[in-house]
C-alpha cells in the first residue's frame, strides 16, 4: 500500500503507452522518462487500500491528493473523493491476474464483470462483449491487462 506506480498498456502495438489522467479523464498516452514533468506526474498513481473494500485497491493521483480514478457511466475519470458510498465503490478495483505474464487486471467492485480497459486512447470500465463499442471482444483480454511499472514521477 501507498506505493507510487505507473500502469503500462500490454496490448501489442501499444506497449509504449501508459495510463494517465488529463482534464479529469483517464486515457493512455506515450509517456516515458524523457517526457515532461507534468505528463509524468499525470501518469503516476499512489496505490491505496480500496475505499469500498479493503482487500482491493484505489488509485489516487500522485499530483492531486484526494482525487482518485473512478468510473462514472463506465468512463474512467479522475475526481475528488466526495465521501459518498457510490464514489467509494466507483473508485475501488480488485486486482486479478492479467492475460500477459506478470500483468494485472483491475476489476470494478460495483459493475459486474467490468474491467479497466483502454480503448481508442480512452479508458473505460468495460464488459467483454457488452453493448458498447469499448466492450468489443477483439483484444479485450490484452486491453484490460496492465503492467505495473516504477512510477514515472518521484
Name every feature range the model reports, one short phrase each.
Residues 1-154:
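Lectin-like carbohydrate-binding module/patch detector with strong preference for beta-trefoil
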Amino acid at each position: 500500500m501507498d506505493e507510487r506506480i505507473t500502469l503500462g498498456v500490454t496490448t501489442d502495438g501499444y506497449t509504449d503507452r501508459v495510463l494517465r489522467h488529463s482534464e479529469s479523464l483517464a486515457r493512455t498516452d506515450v509517456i516515458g522518462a524523457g517526457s515532461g514533468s507534468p505528463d509524468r506526474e499525470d501518469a503516476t498513481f499512489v496505490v491505496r487500500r480500496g475505499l469500498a473494500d479493503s482487500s482491493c485497491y484505489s488509485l489516487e493521483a500522485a499530483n492531486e491528493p484526494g482525487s482518485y480514478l473512478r468510473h462514472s457511466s463506465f468512463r474512467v475519470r479522475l475526481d475528488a473523493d466526495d465521501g459518498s458510498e457510490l464514489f467509494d465503490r466507483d473508485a475501488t478495483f480488485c486486482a486479478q491476474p492479467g492475460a500477459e505474464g506478470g500483468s494485472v487486471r483491475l476489476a470494478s467492485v460495483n459493475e459486474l464483470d467490468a474491467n479497466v480497459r483502454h480503448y481508442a486512447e480512452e479508458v473505460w470500465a468495460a464488459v467483454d462483449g457488452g453493448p458498447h463499442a469499448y466492450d468489443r471482444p477483439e483484444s479485450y483480454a490484452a486491453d484490460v491487462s496492465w503492467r505495473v511499472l516504477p512510477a514515472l514521477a518521484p
